[in-house]
Amino acid sequence: MGRDTLADIITSIRNADMDRKGTVRIPSTNITENIIKILLREGFIENVRKHQEGNFFFFALTLRHRRNRKGPCRTSLNLKRISRPGLRIYSNYQQIPRILGGMGIVILSTSRGIMTDREARLERIGGEILCYIW
């Protein structure tokens, strides 16, 4: 049985944000690198560093936190996995959902690489809906 690396990434970022950790270590793969670039460009994370321990490469993400959060479960970063190995979800560019009226983003895997919903609409291409971030 294989591992769902995208679900592992989403879970580790969500858990670190809920626990108010400053940094998260994520294994380095091509898909994680593309998703981290999107998160950095959209402003959901502050900084990314690539480290190596032996033959193992990983990313160290610095999370962006709100200063005035109250309560243990109030998170500023919500991530939800949509398409999973057991049930793939595809969409054309016209039916890509808008998250919070455009405040959040949808990450898609298209024939031209991994991109956000705005980029996919501009290029008029659809693909597999990987996750929602708001």
Swiss-Prot record:
Location of this chain's protein in the cell: Plastid, Chloroplast
Designated name of the protein: Small ribosomal subunit protein uS8c
Record key words, sorted: Chloroplast, Plastid, Ribonucleoprotein, Ribosomal protein, RNA-binding, rRNA-binding
Function: One of the primary rRNA binding proteins, it binds directly to 16S rRNA central domain where it helps coordinate assembly of the platform of the 30S subunit.
InterPro entries in UniProt: Ribosomal_uS8, Ribosomal_uS8_CS, Ribosomal_uS8_sf
Molecular-function annotations in GO: rRNA binding; structural constituent of ribosome
Family that this chain belongs to: Belongs to the universal ribosomal protein uS8 family.
Keyword hit for Ribosomal protein: yes
A Pfam family matched in the record: Ribosomal_S8
GO biological process, one term: translation
SUPFAM superfamilies: Ribosomal protein S8
Coiled-coil features, chain-numbered ranges: none
Subunit structure: Part of the 30S ribosomal subunit.
Domain of life of the source: Eukaryota
GO CC annotation, single: ribonucleoprotein complex
